[in-house]
């Protein structure tokens, strides 16, 4: 009974890990084992189509978006967008893939799926959904969530969300995810029957744990700072890109004025008419090309936005760890308090001021039978508290191991995806500049022939 309670911070750390960003053989092996569970041909962290057996067996696509009108829970008419999810077998028949399932889902159902995954897989960096309303838009881009271009970009984002889940070695095996792809009727009821809402941590409790935890894990504190920095950098990049798009759009459209001037000028010139007409045509082509260019840019902006929203998924893992750490510290504190009470009853000495000590002085000592009964109750509570503390320690260790394995997987994915997106964006900018040079070269030749 006199044994000091174990240090919850030491118990919550199963083994020393490398700093953020450093490779760790043990964690890599853990990721590999999880991947092996998803399929014999699974190969750990790789591209989406090589992560597990799911995407080797079926193709998942959100192939169509449709505007619909219906009644909501308040029996009020509303307009919404439904998305057609198709799954096809990769095993071809007569040279064509076989359509296995096809159903329509609303955006709110995608949100329900993600909320469920967040509760049941708190140690996993759950893929984010695309934005519900347009953010970081430049002035010519519509912010209306029913705009066809925005709906199309969101359709692509929702397809990417499903592919992210299907490529994850753990999430891909979830039954609710499988039913999301195959069961159109009563799917919401099936999700609600899991009782995931009751298991969700309250925001107030999470906020309380954030400020009251005494021994936070430095790795998760660093991870939280990393997610804040990631969000800040990508937000700044997207804001700058929106301002540049505004300016670039204006520069290109000015060339449309040049084209109109040259065309009108050619009508009053006899010798220079053909050259001016050709130069005006080149200016018009250049001015109209900006629409396709900025449409392509939105594709790369959406890739950046995905990782902007991933930052919140990282913070969700950190919040869960803080909650578990706080619960562990409270359990250790409660156990230490009970041990002290038991020791005071056995020895008859009171170390600190207590209400019980005051009542003893006022109303006299307890009888030996009463004291023995209290000691017995406290000993039972201490045994129960030790078991509870041990259970929380094991749960915490398992959470840290699994969470860190998935964080390392996410960071490799992030580095690969952002590198590819930024390189492709740079190549697109180079191509755009080359086309601009070519237009002015052609215009120069037209002028030189006058």
Swiss-Prot record:
Stored InterPro entries: AH/BAR_dom_sf, PX_dom, PX_dom_sf, PX_SNX4, SNX4, SNX4_BAR
List-wise, which residues carry N-acetylmethionine? Answer: 1
List the Gene Ontology MF annotations in alphabetical order: epidermal growth factor receptor binding; insulin receptor binding; leptin receptor binding; phosphatidylinositol binding; phosphatidylinositol-3-phosphate binding; transferrin receptor binding
Q: How does it sit in the membrane?
A: Peripheral membrane protein
Alphabetically ordered keywords of this record: Acetylation, Endosome, Lipid-binding, Membrane, Phosphoprotein, Protein transport, Transport
Q: Name one GO cellular component term.
A: protein-containing complex
Matches recorded under SUPFAM superfamilies: PX domain
Instruction: Decide whether keyword Transport is in the record.
Output: yes
SMART domains, alphabetically?
PX
Residue numbers binding a 1,2-diacyl-sn-glycero-3-phospho-(1D-myo-inositol-3-phosphate): 106, 108, 132, 154
Where does this protein chiefly localize? membrane
Query: What ranges does the record give for the region Disordered, renumbered to this chain?
Result: 1-46
Which BP terms does GO give this entry?
endocytic recycling; positive regulation of autophagosome assembly; positive regulation of histamine secretion by mast cell; protein transport
Under Pfam families, the record lists: PX (PF00787)
Q: Does the keyword Kinase apply?
A: no
Tell me the residues on which Phosphoserine occurs: 22
Q: Where do the PX domain residues begin and end?
A: 61-187
Where in or outside the cell is it found?
Early endosome membrane
Tell me, in a sentence or two, what this protein's role is: Involved in the regulation of endocytosis and in several stages of intracellular trafficking. Plays a role in recycling endocytosed transferrin receptor and prevent its degradation. Involved in autophagosome assembly by regulating trafficking and recycling of phospholipid scramblase ATG9A.
Family in the record: Belongs to the sorting nexin family.
Question: What interactions and quaternary structure are annotated?
Answer: Heterodimer; heterodimerizes with SNX7 or SNX30. Interacts with WWC1/KIBRA. Identified in a complex with WWC1/KIBRA and dynein components DYNLL1 and DYNC1I2. Interacts with BIN1.
Domain notes per entry: The PX domain binds phosphatidylinositol 3-phosphate which is necessary for peripheral membrane localization.
Write down what this protein is called: Sorting nexin-4
List the gene name. SNX4
């Amino acid at each position: 009974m006199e044994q000091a309670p174990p240090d919850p911070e030491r118990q919550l750390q199963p083994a020393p890990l490398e700093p953020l960003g450093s490779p760790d053989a043990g964690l890599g092996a853990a990721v590999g084992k999880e991947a092996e569970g998803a399929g014999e041909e699974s190969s750990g962290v790789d591209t989406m189509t090589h992560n597990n057996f799911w995407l080797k067996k079926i193709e998942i696509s959100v192939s169509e978006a449709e505007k619909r009108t219906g009644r909501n829970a308040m029996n009020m008419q509303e307009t919404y967008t439904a998305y057609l999810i198709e799954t096809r077998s990769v095993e071809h028949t007569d040279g064509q893939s076989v359509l296995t399932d096809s159903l329509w889902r609303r955006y709110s159902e995608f949100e329900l799926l993600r909320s469920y995954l967040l509760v049941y897989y708190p140690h996993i960096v759950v893929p984010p959904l695309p934005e519900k309303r347009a953010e970081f838009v430049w002035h010519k881009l519509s912010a209306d969530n029913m705009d066809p271009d925005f709906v199309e970009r969101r359709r692509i984002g929702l397809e990417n969300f499903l592919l992210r889940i299907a490529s994850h070695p753990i999430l891909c095996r979830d039954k609710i995810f499988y039913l999301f792809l195959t069961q159109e009727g009563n799917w919401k009821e099936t999700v609600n029957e899991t009782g995931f809402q009751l298991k969700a941590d309250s925001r107030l409790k999470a906020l309380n744990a954030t400020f009251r935890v005494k021994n936070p894990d430095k790795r998760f504190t660093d991870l939280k700072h990393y997610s804040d920095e990631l969000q800040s950098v990508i937000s700044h990049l997207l804001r700058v890109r929106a301002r540049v798009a505004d300016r670039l759009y204006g520069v290109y459209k000015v060339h449309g004025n040049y084209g109109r001037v040259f065309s009108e000028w050619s009508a009053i010139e006899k010798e220079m008419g053909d050259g001016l007409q050709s130069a005006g045509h080149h200016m018009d082509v250049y001015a109209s090309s900006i629409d396709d260019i900025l449409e392509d840019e939105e594709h790369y902006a959406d890739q950046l936005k995905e990782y902007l929203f991933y930052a919140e998924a990282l913070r969700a893992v950190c919040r869960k760890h803080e909650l578990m750490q706080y619960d562990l510290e409270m359990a250790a504190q409660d156990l230490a308090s009970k041990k002290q009470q038991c020791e005071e009853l056995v020895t008859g000495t009171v170390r600190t001021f207590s209400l019980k000590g005051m009542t003893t002085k006022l109303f006299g000592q307890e009888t030996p039978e009463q004291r023995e009964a209290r000691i017995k109750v406290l000993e039972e509570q201490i045994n129960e508290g030790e078991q509870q503390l041990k259970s929380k320690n094991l749960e915490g260790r398992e959470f840290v191991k699994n969470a860190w394995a998935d964080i390392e997987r996410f960071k490799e994915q992030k580095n690969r995806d952002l590198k590819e997106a930024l390189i492709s964006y740079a190549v697109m900018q180079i191509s755009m500049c080359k086309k601009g040079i070519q237009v002015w070269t052609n215009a120069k030749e037209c002028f030189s022939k006058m």
